[in-house]
């Protein structure tokens, strides 16, 4: 089976979110857009390390980078909420699967007799 583009996007998002530092960066950026320096201070990370993490988040489409009109050197980072939709959709499918499995298990546990099985 050929992977779909959505599969690549989902894999990139999960890969980017697999790192605790990047998840913390996302949490901070959900509060408000931030400059790289401010973000580095919040997560106590060197500018070089922060740059590597931001590159992964941008490549996955989870974070965008914007310039400031008056100063081309200043970069503002913000979360791209729409990039999380494939993750949310996949999680909803998994949740639905588990809900159905647990309902079936509950029904079996509440009525253990199967048709054609002798009473004990």
Predicted regions and their residues:
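C-terminal regulatory/oligomerization modules of transcriptional regulators
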Residues: 1-9, 31-47, 59-64, 81-120
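Pre-recognition alpha-helix immediately N-terminal to the DNA-recognition helix
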Residues: 23-25
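Residues within the DNA-recognition helix of helix-turn-helix
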Residues: 53
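Short, Lys/Arg-rich nucleic-acid/phosphate-binding segment
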Residues: 67-76
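Short alpha-helical segment immediately N-terminal to, or the first helix within
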Residues: 27-29
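Alpha-helical DNA-recognition elements
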Residues: 56
């Amino acid at each position: 089976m050929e992977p779909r583009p959505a599969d690549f996007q989902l894999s990139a998002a999960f890969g980017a979110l697999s790192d605790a530092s990047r998840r913390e960066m996302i949490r901070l950026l959900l509060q408000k857009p931030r400059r790289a320096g401010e973000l580095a201070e919040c997560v106590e990370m060197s500018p070089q390390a922060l740059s590597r993490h931001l590159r992964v988040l941008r490549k996955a489409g989870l974070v965008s980078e914007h310039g400031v009109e008056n100063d081309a050197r200043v970069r503002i980072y913000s979360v791209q909420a729409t990039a999380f939709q494939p993750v949310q959709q996949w999680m909803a499918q998994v949740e639905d699967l588990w809900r159905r499995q647990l309902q079936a298990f509950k029904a079996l546990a509440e009525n253990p007799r199967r048709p054609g099985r002798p009473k004990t």
